Each structure stands twice: as structure tokens, then as C-alpha cells.
Amino acid sequence: MAVTDIFARRATLARSVRLLSQFRYERSEPARFYGALAADTAAMVDDLWRAGHGESAAGRTLLDVGGGPGYFAAAFTDAGVRYLGVEPDPGEMHAAGPVVAADTGTFVRASGMALPFADDSVDICLSSNVAEHVPRPWQLGAEMLRVTRPGGLAVLSYTVWLGPFGGHEMGLTHYLGGARAAERYARKHGHPAKNNYGSSLFEVSVADGLAWAASTGAALAAFPRYHPRWAWSLTSVPVLREFLVSNLVLVLQPQ
């Protein structure tokens, strides 16, 4: 069984529409948006684990690189997974306030590019929408592989720069160029974007991600995170994939 076989059954058009419809609530109702994304991600990771290991990920240890304020912690804890979260920004770690229970995992303040964990120390290492926010995304990926036990899973998902969501809060102006989009945003709002091009937002392509994954010798699968199964073949079409694969998932297994 391929690692994506179980998840592929759930990757329907209805799921895609449901997830994408939540994006409009990212700023106005973050609990609604991130709660839905976290629940879907926990289910996706469990599907990937189940396909490769024949059992649920419940009871396994998962390290979430860039876990944020705790919505993912709650979703994985509810699924029976032992959750460890890494977040470099203390503001993000506490942003959820009282919505996250005290017993939903362990959190560490650290950089994803220098994880403070031993080699082969977790069963699953996840990074969701973080790689585009660090200057060296494949160093982050290498760290994820380092801490994942042989036979475990590293799941690296990131927003593709040339996709429709690549500019984050800058909207589609990123197609004018990152620096110009950042200038336009600052001029309009009177302050830089939270995801500011060149400091907290960087260009990451599908091609670069696929090339890096292939170079590790650990790649199992690559697919568009929010697309229905019948659209996954877009990942293999050069140029077009950069615009139509809005978020790429790389699944790797250290040996």
C-alpha cells in the first residue's frame, strides 16, 4: 500500500471546498479557521501513518515544528498522539489564550532550523506552513529528518510562492514581485505585513521542494494539500504546478 492510499480516499472535492471556505475566517475568527485546519491535518497524518504501518498514530510521539498557539496541539492530543510543539515566537505560543487546555502537549521555544532534540527521537515530525517563513527551508527539512526515527514519517507542508496564497496577507500583489508587494502593503496599512517579504516570508517553489526531497533518498510522496485526488497530477507538470499547487506536502521516511 502506498503511503497516500488511505488519505487519497478522503481527498475529495467536498473536502477541498470545505477547507478553502474556511480561509476567509483566518483573521476574523482564527479559532474557526485554525481549528478546522488542525483537525484536517491530524486526520491526514493519521491516514499517512496508518497506510505505512497498518495502525493508527495514536500513542506515537509527534513533533510539530512551528506549532503556533495550540490548535494543532489540541487536535493531535484529541487523536491520542503525544504532542511536542516547537515555536520560536513566544507571542505565537500564547496567542490562543484559554482555548487550549493545559494538558494538550509540551511546547518548546526553539528554531526549526536547529531543533533541540536528539537524533531519531520522534515517530512523526510535522511542519505545516512554516518552510516559507524561514530563510533556509531545506535546513529545516534536514532537521526534521534528523530527529525522526528510522521507519517514522516526516511530513513537510508549505505554501508555494507563486500559488494564489503565496503572498499571504499581501494578497495577489506578490505577482508584482515580493519587494514591491511588501512596499505596497506597508504604504497602504502604515506598517509592514506580519509575513513580510525578505524577513518572515520567502519564495519557495514546488520544483525546489521536489528536488530537495529526491536528494534525501527518503521521499515517499508529494501531493497538493488542498486539492482533490484527481488533481494531484498537477504536481508533476513543470511551471503549471507553481501556480496551481497552492500548498505542497512532502512525505519522507528516514531509513
UniProtKB/Swiss-Prot annotation:
Its EC number is 2.1.1.-. SUPFAM superfamilies: S-adenosyl-L-methionine-dependent methyltransferases (SSF53335). One of its GO terms (biological process) is methylation. GO terms for molecular function: S-adenosylmethionine-dependent methyltransferase activity. Keywords: Methyltransferase, Transferase. Belongs to the methyltransferase superfamily. PANTHER family: 2-METHOXY-6-POLYPRENYL-1,4-BENZOQUINOL METHYLASE, MITOCHONDRIAL, METHYLTRANSFERASE. This is Uncharacterized methyltransferase MAP_3663c. It comes from Mycolicibacterium paratuberculosis (strain ATCC BAA-968 / K-10).
